């Protein structure tokens, strides 16, 4: 549906002339007829006032104050600007035409430009949202890889050395994830037996680590030795 058919008010004479110029010139072009130079501009003024040759008086339709001196040497620029204005149905308004020339002949151009801008903005936002989603997914995967690496490294620590593990990962993995890894890991060590997570929930995690490391170092020699040999790398060394 054309912008003309969407109009809610009757078209003025110049608006009707502009749309007739578009229709007639496009028809001649599709029929393969040879078009004169600046065919849309010529058709517009012919439909508007019957002019066969575009004169200063015709161009004053766009700028009433235009003088012969101003037109001299610039006639081609004026005709080209009018031709492009009509051909693009107001989408392109070049100098020396005044800024309101497009809306005078094609009032719907403002709506069309605004809708196109809105559509473009929507596409940009959609692309940005997809990009954000991809980046968020990549960050989540990278973070999960860090958590997995922290879990692997924790397996090679005993309660005596777990403090160094916490120091290494405390600024790279969220504390609640470190806590989960710690409590799962600690279930297999005798020196940590009997520890219940809920009993330590009001204590900062770094303090839990410090106290459990101290308790492990104060445990009996047999317990410490057993826990050291429970660490996988110790088992490999023994082999």
Swiss-Prot record:
Keywords: Plasmid. InterPro entries: Uncharacterised_PsiA. Not yet known. NCBIfam families: PRK13704.1. To PsiA protein of plasmid F. This is Protein PsiA. It comes from Escherichia coli. The gene is psiA.
């Amino acid at each position: 549906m054309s912008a003309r058919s969407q109009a809610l008010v009757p078209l003025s004479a110049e608006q009707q002339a502009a749309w007739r110029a578009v229709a007639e010139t496009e028809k001649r072009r599709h029929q393969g007829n040879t078009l004169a130079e600046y065919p849309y501009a010529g058709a517009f003024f012919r439909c508007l006032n019957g002019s066969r040759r575009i004169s200063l008086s015709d161009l004053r339709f766009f700028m009433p104050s235009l003088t012969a001196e101003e037109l001299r040497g610039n006639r081609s620029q004026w005709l080209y600007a009018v031709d492009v204005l009509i051909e693009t149905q107001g989408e392109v308004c070049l100098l020396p035409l005044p800024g309101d020339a497009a809306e005078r002949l094609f009032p719907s151009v403002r709506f069309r430009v605004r809708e196109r801008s809105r559509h473009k903005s929507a596409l940009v936002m959609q692309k940005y949202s997809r990009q954000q989603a991809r980046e968020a997914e990549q960050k989540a995967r990278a973070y999960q890889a860090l958590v997995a690496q922290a879990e692997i490294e924790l397996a090679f620590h005993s309660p005596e050395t777990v403090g160094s593990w916490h120091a290494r990962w405390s600024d790279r993995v969220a504390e609640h994830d470190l806590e989960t890894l710690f409590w799962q890991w600690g279930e297999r060590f005798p020196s940590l037996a009997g520890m219940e997570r809920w009993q330590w929930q009001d204590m900062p995690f770094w303090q839990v680590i410090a106290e459990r490391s101290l308790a492990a170092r104060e445990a009996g020699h047999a317990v410490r030795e057993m826990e050291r040999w429970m660490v996988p790398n110790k088992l490999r060394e023994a082999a």
